[in-house]
C-alpha cells in the first residue's frame, strides 16, 4: 500500500507487533485537548487504499483507559478513493484534566479491511429470522447457557 508523507520527518503507519490488526497513526503536530472537548488532530499522511478495501480509524485502548481519550466518530472511515490527509477527531472525556499531544504521539490506529459493495433491493416484507424485530438488550445481560 502506498503512503504519502506530507511533511519532512513524518510518520509512516506501523504495527507495534507482527500480529497486530491496527497500524498506529501518529500526530503531525502538538495539541492540547481541554476536558470535555474535541479536536481534529492531523497525521501528516495520505494513503491510497486499493479498490474493495476501506480504512477504519479506531481508538487506542491505552489512551481510552488511562486518559479518557477516544474518537468522536468511531470508527472513522477512509474510503478507497480518498487521497487527502488523514485526520483524527479525538475527544477528551475527562472532566478536569487537559490532554497534551506531542508531535509523533500515537493517537489512533488504522485497521484496513475488505468491504462488500452491496446493492439494495426494495421489498414489501423482509423474510423472517430467529431474532425478528427484537432490538437493544434482546439477548440479555447474563449468560443463560447453564
Swiss-Prot record:
Substrate binds at residues 60-62, 73, 77-79. Pfam families: dUTPase. Keywords: Hydrolase, Magnesium, Metal-binding, Nucleotide metabolism. HAMAP family: dUTPase_bact. Its cofactor is Mg(2+). One of its GO terms (biological process) is dUTP catabolic process. This enzyme is involved in nucleotide metabolism: it produces dUMP, the immediate precursor of thymidine nucleotides and it decreases the intracellular concentration of dUTP so that uracil cannot be incorporated into DNA. GO terms for molecular function: dUTP diphosphatase activity; magnesium ion binding. It comes from the Bacteria. This is Deoxyuridine 5'-triphosphate nucleotidohydrolase. The keyword ATP-binding does not apply. The keyword Magnesium applies. It comes from Tropheryma whipplei (strain Twist). Belongs to the dUTPase family. Its EC number is 3.6.1.23. It catalyses: dUTP + H2O = dUMP + diphosphate + H(+). Pathway: Pyrimidine metabolism; dUMP biosynthesis; dUMP from dCTP (dUTP route): step 2/2. InterPro entries: dUTPase, dUTPase-like, dUTPase-like_sf, dUTPase_trimeric.
